[in-house]
């Protein structure tokens, strides 16, 4: 990325989805923060403080209809996955080699099996995962438990693939990147967590339906590009390469505004595909199938991730408070923080 890439215009993006918070968000944030503080490793007090600022905001936005007892599990599982994701770009941690990442993924997989967690580089993550997985496995219906387990194992494998890609210098082709991120962005896991949260047990026929397969692809693309739109300043500061905006801007292939506009176009196209496929699936659903509340939960998830990505201190810097503008000028500041102003687009 060149030295001139410090500012871009964010237009008003039309959305057909509405974000909402879980009605017991303050209580969940307190309980989830206490669990994360006790169970997860942090590098220092500042690291812990910064993480606990937003530890449960993401799950409270993306699964707002989950029952309270299951929402506690979702908060804790989300915290584990988020902290693991933070370790991957660190060359002094599990990200220092594909072999280290593979060993770490095996350790995490063992935590899902009920076996004793073996010693490893970050035993805190595996033991925390074992704790929350034990609770989830005891409540989930067999099919839901299997979908959660498969999606977690797939996520761990994608973490290894991400580390391997970083070691090779990252991606230069957007299509290859999107293919990997279809797994590593956690869309499959987030969807299974949505099913668990509302207490559904969906029919197997849904998961073999071609229209549902296409809907899941739209979910993954929406999550990926929304994340990348709002996180690239943060990820650039961390020396990251796993971001669509950074890939499009690499080696001067596109100016920042052009890259942002491309990503915004992909977000809007993914949302249009999602809503069209959702409506077709709803037209065929029966009340007994539980498909309608599940698809509503997926729509909540996309809207919540959009709001979270726009407003989170995780991506915009400690202490960030949203103004709350949804369009205007986004300024990238030294240290990876951002600010939003209502300045007119230079071309307008």
Residues covered by each model-derived region:
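Alpha-helical, largely C-terminal catalytic domains
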Residues: 1-348
């Amino acid at each position: 990325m060149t030295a001139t890439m410090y500012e871009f215009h964010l237009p008003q993006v039309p959305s057909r989805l509405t974000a909402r918070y879980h009605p017991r968000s303050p209580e969940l944030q307190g309980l989830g923060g206490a669990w994360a503080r006790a169970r997860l490793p942090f590098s220092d007090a500042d690291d812990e403080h910064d993480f606990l600022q937003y530890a449960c905001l993401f799950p409270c936005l993306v699964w707002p209809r989950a029952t309270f007892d299951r929402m506690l599990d979702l908060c804790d599982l989300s915290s584990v996955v988020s902290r693991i994701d933070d370790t991957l770009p660190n060359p002094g941690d599990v990200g220092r080699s594909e072999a280290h990442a593979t060993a770490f993924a095996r350790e995490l997989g063992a935590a899902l099996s009920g076996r004793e967690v073996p010693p490893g580089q970050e035993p805190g993550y595996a033991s925390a995962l074992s704790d929350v997985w034990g609770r989830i496995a005891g409540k989930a219906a067999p099919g839901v438990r299997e979908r959660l387990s498969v999606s977690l194992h797939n996520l761990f494998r994608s973490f290894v693939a991400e580390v391997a890609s970083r070691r090779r210098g990252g991606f230069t082709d957007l299509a290859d990147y999107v293919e990997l991120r279809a797994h590593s962005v956690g869309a499959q896991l987030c969807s299974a967590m949505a099913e668990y949260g509302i207490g559904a047990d969906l029919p197997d026929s849904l998961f073999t339906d071609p229209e549902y397969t296409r809907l899941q692809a739209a979910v993954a693309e929406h999550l990926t590009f929304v994340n990348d739109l709002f996180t690239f300043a943060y990820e650039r500061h961390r020396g990251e390469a796993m971001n669509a905006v950074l890939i499009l801007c690499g080696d001067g292939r596109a100016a920042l505004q052009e890259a942002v506009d491309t990503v915004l176009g992909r977000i809007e196209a993914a949302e249009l595909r999602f809503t069209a496929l959702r409506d077709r699936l709803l037209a065929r659903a029966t009340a007994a199938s539980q498909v309608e509340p599940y698809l509503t939960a997926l729509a909540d998830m996309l809207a919540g991730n959009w709001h979270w990505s726009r407003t989170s201190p995780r991506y915009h810097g400690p202490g960030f408070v949203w103004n709350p503008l949804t369009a205007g000028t986004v300024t990238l500041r030294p240290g990876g923080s951002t600010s939003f102003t209502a300045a007119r687009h230079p071309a307008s």
